[in-house]
UniProtKB/Swiss-Prot annotation:
Assigned EC number: 7.3.2.1
Topology with respect to the bilayer: Peripheral membrane protein
Subunit field text: The complex is composed of two ATP-binding proteins (PstB), two transmembrane proteins (PstC and PstA) and a solute-binding protein (PstS).
Family statement drawn from the similarity comment of this UniProt entry: Belongs to the ABC transporter superfamily. Phosphate importer (TC 3.A.1.7) family.
Keywords annotated in UniProt: ATP-binding, Cell inner membrane, Cell membrane, Membrane, Nucleotide-binding, Phosphate transport, Translocase, Transport
CDD domains assigned: ABC_PstB_phosphate_transporter
Catalytic activity: phosphate(out) + ATP + H2O = ADP + 2 phosphate(in) + H(+)
ABC transporter domain span: 28-269
Protein name: Phosphate import ATP-binding protein PstB
Domain of life: Bacteria
Molecular functions (GO terms): ATP binding; ATP hydrolysis activity; ATPase-coupled phosphate ion transmembrane transporter activity
Gene: pstB
GO annotation terms (biological process): phosphate ion transmembrane transport
Length: 274
């Protein structure tokens, strides 16, 4: 990554031109989004687009709201009482905040990979087949093909093709995370959410996940939350900087990291806080 240096000091407070929506069609459109934990407003008037077949990175200090925003995209907050979202989150023109929405179908369309690998306590084969069976009834031969395709898509097939009956828990940490990615894409989502997917992995495993993300964007729209700013710079086309529940700056990744409009973005990127 190119060394980042700044020759000017930016003014404090909101900066004009700090929110630049990506070019091209939007897969997800967020408008006037607010989110509440009880009476506490955790997200404040968020407006942004996730470009189709691109990687959008969310950065910011702990507690800034980036993971909260990510989990709104597949309504994970519905699992917890007292949490609610207001505004619009449009997926291909349909508001996913609609209370009548089928959440199982939404979570098939919007998959998620978590910080810690979470393989099911079952075989590698069944880790992949389990999700497919929730939505489809297919023959054994069709299932075999789908499992292989998902494992290839997760860059894991060549490492496990001779031990599909082994437990998913027997794999290394990096392999387990790729298994979780394969499990996610097996149900044919349109959007994949990554919440700190490499924070528990070694550098070699991290590099494999980053290479995989670059390949996956050919078929999927991707959003990734990361504390690793170098990772955000490597894998994404657009970057959003969040602070205290607000979207401070959003635009092309190169610009965010080399010439941000807002002083808070500059201070975070240069390590002055966070």
């Amino acid at each position: 990554m190119t060394d980042i240096s700044f020759t000017t000091s930016l003014p404090a407070g909101p900066a004009p031109g700090a929110i630049v929506q990506p070019e091209g069609p939007a897969k997800v459109t967020v408008r006037d989004l607010n989110f509440y934990y009880g009476d506490n407003r955790a997200l404040k008037d968020i407006n942004l687009n996730l470009a189709a077949n691109r990687v959008t990175a969310f950065i910011g200090p702990s507690g800034c709201g980036k993971s909260t925003l990510l989990r709104i995209f597949n309504r994970m907050y519905d699992l917890y009482p007292g949490q609610r979202a207001e505004g619009q989150v449009m997926l291909d023109g349909h508001n996913i905040l609609d209370p009548k929405l089928d959440l199982n179908l939404l979570r098939a369309r919007v998959g998620m990979v978590f910080q810690k690998p979470t393989p099911f306590p079952m075989t590698i084969y069944e880790n992949i087949a389990f999700g497919i069976r929730l939505y489809e009834k297919i023959s054994k031969s069709e299932m075999d093909g789908r499992v292989e395709k998902a494992l290839r898509g997760g860059a894991l097939w060549n490492e496990v093709k001779d031990k599909l009956s082994a437990s998913g828990l027997s794999l290394s940490g990096g392999q387990q995370q790729r298994l979780c990615i394969a499990r996610t894409i097996a149900v044919r989502p349109e959007v994949i959410l990554f919440d700190e997917p490499c924070s528990a992995l070694d550098p070699i495993s991290t590099a494999k996940i980053e290479e995989l993300i670059d390949e996956l964007k050919e078929e999927y729209t991707i959003a990734i939350v990361t504390h690793n700013m170098q990772q955000a710079a490597r894998v994404s086309e657009s970057t959003a900087f969040m602070y205290l529940g607000e979207l401070i700056e959003f635009g092309p990744t190169d610009k965010i990291f080399t010439s941000p409009n807002d002083r808070r973005t500059q201070d975070y990127i240069t390590g002055r806080f966070g």
